[in-house]
């Protein structure tokens, strides 16, 4: 078998002229253009002359002459790297000029609306599990630990997806990897609505999280490469609005769908498709629509130029120019660019010997090659010349996520705590009551019965909710068709009593004494108690929290290019830290909702500025990788914030408030050490 030579995403180049050499073995592909239309065969001129692209035959002859020089290795790796860096700097300035010529118009806005759906999918993913859990826990009989793992697994998936898919986007392309991310998210999110078991549901949400975790880094890197310097800060901030729109969408859909228990069906006794599963499918729609729409958008020309694909990049830039000019009513305006500088390509050859003949062995070599390149690229971001910027950004991303996600979980938990305290304050206590021969068929709620005596009483088709019988004597009583939530019998004596078709299981009797009592045909299903939360309030709190960021988003978008990224980050984080101290006065549900809206509204500007400066600080071949690393650290901060802040609910408000404020102040001050990128071209 002939040896197989693999070059990872790179093509040969001619060092003397800097043009991209496409796949020279297929000249017909290079020769397709509308420019040559109408020529006779004898007079036909190669289309590349109009674009500044050499004829493939000339390229072949030059490469044949140069082959010995490359084989001899006259220029070392360091020389090639130096030339490449010089080429990249020239390309950055030329590309900025080209984007200015292309203008900002219909093409960018079309791409904008495609990408906002991808960002919405990311925002939805944060909320979908928390909204579905109150209903899903009953179907799947989830304990507190299982519910906690379900919330954690989504963030772990998003963290892994940001690392892996962000790195792949710098090697395989923005569009390709973003499509892959959205496909993974949409397919596994939809699949999770159909699976019945907890393990399968957990796995689907993990893979769905991996898919959506890669979207955020790629979306910002992709869109930034179609924007000019004057438009970049503002329009990336407009893009950031739609992350929070995902929260609004999820809240509205949960409010509209989940309470409708009839929106479902059953197949036999083992398969149930309830309304919360419909909600999960609806939440996968933004990713699905974005994935389909993305098929009609081109790859980033800046990425293609980085890969040395000059002609493909030129055609896309011409498409951007022509689309915008037609929309402005000047279709006659000609795209004047004929030649774009492309960086020297650092070829990597992987030789596969004839013994490596099976498809999976070749696939494994390709996989290991790409993995090594992604890993090396990530190390370059962390340990190369950008290490100080990466370290500072890591601190800012982490502290921002720790405080923001920690508080956004703490707010609804505190609201539930206030609800529980108010509920307990209305508890009725009955002491020493004696009831004989009564038939009870109504709901008993929020009561404590102590040292009572119930003789020959019947409890028929009734519901116990938050009821405690303590040191109570039951004699010749009868319980039938009884359901209960958070109801217990403690230190009771139960004599000659029958329990028929009830959910009063063994664990609900604590240190009780049974004498000649029987349990007949107990209710089947889950033996756990589940709280009936005020779903309306939960959805309303999330809806208002997401809606409150809209003013902050608009202000940050309008001021991003005027005051700069650093002032926006530092100012927003410091103001948010001050807002944290107002939480000491949040002693009611309404006050806590109000302070939540204020905090979210002031902190969003820092998030937008972080997205913009992260995109601008790194070159094209590290942009998505660095963004993915930092976004992965953000999800780690979110996990720690959720865990730490939730543990202090009902214990103290001091620790969460001081921790959030200190994190925001520290991160805001550290951010001021970053370089300002407002006037910087995109490298």
Curated annotation (Swiss-Prot):
A molecular function (GO) held by this record is: transmembrane transporter activity
List the residue ranges of the region (Disordered). Answer: 1-72
Residue list for modification Phosphoserine:
33
Q: Give the UniProt tissue specificity note.
A: Widely expressed throughout the brain. Specifically expressed by pinealocytes in the pineal gland. Also detected in testis (at protein level). Specifically expressed in neural tissues. Expressed in the spinal cord and in all brain regions with a stronger expression in hippocampus and cortex.
Could you describe the post-translational modifications of this protein?
A: N-glycosylated. The N-terminal cytoplasmic domain is phosphorylated by CK1.
Which InterPro entries does the entry link to?
LD_SV2 (IPR055415), MFS (IPR011701), MFS_dom (IPR020846), MFS_sugar_transport-like (IPR005828), MFS_trans_sf (IPR036259), Sugar_transporter_CS (IPR005829), SV2 (IPR022308)
Q: Biological process GO annotation list? A: chemical synaptic transmission; neurotransmitter uptake; regulation of presynaptic cytosolic calcium ion concentration; regulation of synaptic vesicle exocytosis
Question: What are the Basic and acidic residues biased-composition ranges?
Answer: 1-10
Please list every transmembrane segment annotated in the UniProt record, as residue ranges.
111-131, 149-169, 183-203, 206-226, 238-258, 278-298, 391-411, 536-556, 566-586, 593-613, 627-649, 654-672
Single GO cellular component annotation? glutamatergic synapse
Q: Which residues are glycosylated?
A: 441, 491, 516
Q: Which UniProt keywords apply?
A: Cytoplasmic vesicle, Glycoprotein, Membrane, Neurotransmitter transport, Phosphoprotein, Receptor, Synapse, Transmembrane, Transmembrane helix, Transport
Fill in the subunit field for this protein: Interacts with SYT1 in a calcium-independent manner. Forms a complex with SYT1, syntaxin-1 and SNAP25.
Q: What is this protein called?
A: Synaptic vesicle glycoprotein 2B
Organism source for this protein?
Answer: Rattus norvegicus
